[in-house]
Amino acid sequence: MKIAVTYDNGKIFQHFGKSQYMKIYETDENGEIQKVHIESMGKHSHHGIAGYIKEMGVETVICGGLGQGAVDSLEKAGITIYAGNSGNADMAVIKYLKGELIKNSDANCDHHHE
């Protein structure tokens, strides 16, 4: 399984669509982390990120806030969303793998895109 975390300097970046990096965790069938790397989102932003990480095989996203457009794109791509998180990215993934990370359905950000 692959898990993507919006990432900035060791922490969960708080705006999915503006995240410049995703930290990608690859686990084995026992839920043990096997590989970790940081992927630049480069030219991808907002709705484009969902398709890009889907192509990488990501199944779950851990992030801070995200807009409804990103939610729709991720859900359409079949990616599970764990929003409303903050703090250390590695610790969030460990909590997720232990079944301790809680989904927050109220973590959508309401803003206008230019």
Please tell me what each predicted stretch does.
Residues 7, 64-65, 85-86:
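Short secondary-structure boundary segments
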Residues 68-112:
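C-terminal structural segments of small proteins and small subunits
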Residues 2-41:
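N-terminal first-folded block
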Residues 11, 48-49, 91-92:
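Short acidic active-site motifs
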Residues 34-56:
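Compact, glycine-rich, soluble single-domain proteins
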Residues 15, 44-46, 111-113:
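Histidine-centered active-site/metal-ligand motif
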